[in-house]
Amino acid sequence: MILHVVLFRPRAGLEEGQRQDLAKAFASAIDNISAIKRARIGRRRTHGRAYEQLMRVDYTYAAILEFEDLAGLRAYLEHPAHTELGARFFDCFEQALMYDFDVYDGHVGLNTLLEEEL
């Protein structure tokens, strides 16, 4: 499985209409791109732990999309609904990180820590 992880902070002064357009573009991607197996989008939660203070950037939101394989991720990235989402997204964020990860369930995933490349 591949996770497409996006951490982002909207730019200051983002208008309500722009937020709504971004949410609609996310919804359209989720509804129209069958390669997305699961989508989770939410706001950062803090609860007073020391590690929260160590973060250099406060990313307010996360979007985590799951794909069965690389072909699914590529289908998502090349889909017109993603193109529209990207246009809205890049117009709205102040800072963002985007990563793709191969992930495995349970102990199988731990084996990746044993690989040479850390």
What are these regions (language model features)?
Residues 1-61, 68-75, 102-118:
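Short S/T/G/P-rich N-terminal loop/turn motif that feeds into the first structured element of a domain
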Residues 70-103:
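C-terminal structural segments of small proteins and small subunits
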